[in-house]
Swiss-Prot record:
It comes from Bartonella tribocorum (strain CIP 105476 / IBS 506). This is Ribosomal RNA small subunit methyltransferase H. CDD domains: AdoMet_MTases. Its main location: cytoplasm. One of its GO terms (molecular function) is rRNA (cytosine-N4-)-methyltransferase activity.
Length: 332
């Protein structure tokens, strides 16, 4: 058994029981797991008798999942693809889609991937291992653009100070390691005894989201799921921070037939409902799960049931997102 297989065996998927209860996978049901990761949801769905198409853009996850393909052949199909393209892998409507947004435990545990400052490694953070890295971003974007990334994607209160520090320090020595960046941020911001959250947490979150275009990926994935679900099909989304959760909430509200009501956004005209919520406010982990799996602390599950109405047009404006500079100098 490889190290990746061992990590997958130890992986505990968050909110698994609420996910299964909500999706209600019947024997033979066709389900898309858009974020395969360590395969926790996929394995549970297969054990329930479902047929699963599992996607992941991380080649390491695909390689680690081959043993699961062999175990459940022919009911599991594993595809190296971003979940925003999930409507490209099916020709018929499906019964359910599940998305577990963000970084996986396996990615966090591998120091060489550069997702976490808990273990020193290269400042990388690329899920697909292609394109620009977090080091590229930190060492080349202007301070004002870094500040917007930290503020918008990480909700970091010291975004400006941290960005200016980075710009000044990199002129002398570039940031190449996760530990180096985390230490520099902690030295600038400080850390009080007993602080539960490391001062670099939000900056690392923002960089990861930016490098992997996770916000754009989530938006496109929600629209794609709307197109592939049959009437009565269920869409479940597990998110781990408020920015993602607000996007998911806005999506379901905009698809409820009631339109969006916000003084900050243009009002969306009423359209036929394409989803109705399965439960109000989302589901979070109970005390038992929190004790068994601390990672579930920030997880929230929202779920909707597809109606027979036609899928609505994609409209990024409904998410109310601010623009940030792209690495190439345009807009992301």
């Amino acid at each position: 058994m490889t190290k990746q297989d061992q990590r997958a065996e130890r992986h505990i998927p968050v909110l698994l029981q609420p996910v299964l209860a909500g999706l209600m996978p019947l024997v033979g049901a066709k389900v898309i797991d858009g974020t395969f990761g360590a395969g926790g949801y996929t394995r549970a769905l297969l054990k329930a008798g479902a047929q699963v198409i599992a996607l992941d853009r991380d080649p390491h996850a695909i390689a680690a999942g081959q043993s699961l393909v062999d175990e459940f052949f022919p009911r599991l199909r594993l595809v190296h693809m971003e979940f925003s393209q999930l409507d490209r892998v099916v020709e018929e409507k499906v019964d359910a889609v599940i998305l577990d947004i963000g970084v996986s435990s396996m990615q966090l545990d591998e120091a060489e991937r550069g997702f976490s400052f808990q273990k020193d490694g290269p400042l990388d953070m690329r899920m697909a291992q292609t394109g620009f890295s977090a080091s590229d971003v930190v060492n080349h974007l202007k301070a004002k653009d870094l500040a917007r990334i930290f503020k918008i994607l990480g909700e970091e209160r010291y975004a400006g100070r941290i960005a200016r520090m980075i710009e000044k320090r990199r002129a002398v020595q570039p940031f190449l390691r996760t530990g180096d960046l985390a230490y520099a941020i902690e030295a600038l911001v400080g850390r009080k005894p007993g602080d539960r959250i490391h001062p670099a947490t939000r900056v690392f979150q923002a960089l990861r989201i930016y490098v992997n275009d996770e916000i754009g990926e989530l938006a496109r994935g929600l629209f794609a799921a709307e197109r592939v679900l049959k009437a009565g099909g269920r869409l479940g989304v597990v998110s781990f921070h408020s920015l993602e959760d607000r996007m998911v909430k806005r999506f379901f509200v905009s698809r409820s037939g009631e339109g969006m009501r916000s003084r900050h956004l243009p009002e969306i005209k009423h359209s036929p409902a394409t989803f109705f919520p399965l439960f109000k406010g989302g589901i979070t982990a109970n005390k038992e799960e929190l004790q068994q799996n601390p990672r579930s602390r920030s997880a929230r599950l929202r779920m909707g049931v597809r109606t027979n109405a036609e899928a609505l047009a994609e409209d990024m404006k409904l998410f109310g997102l601010a623009e940030i500079a792209s690495f190439e100098g345009g807009k992301k």
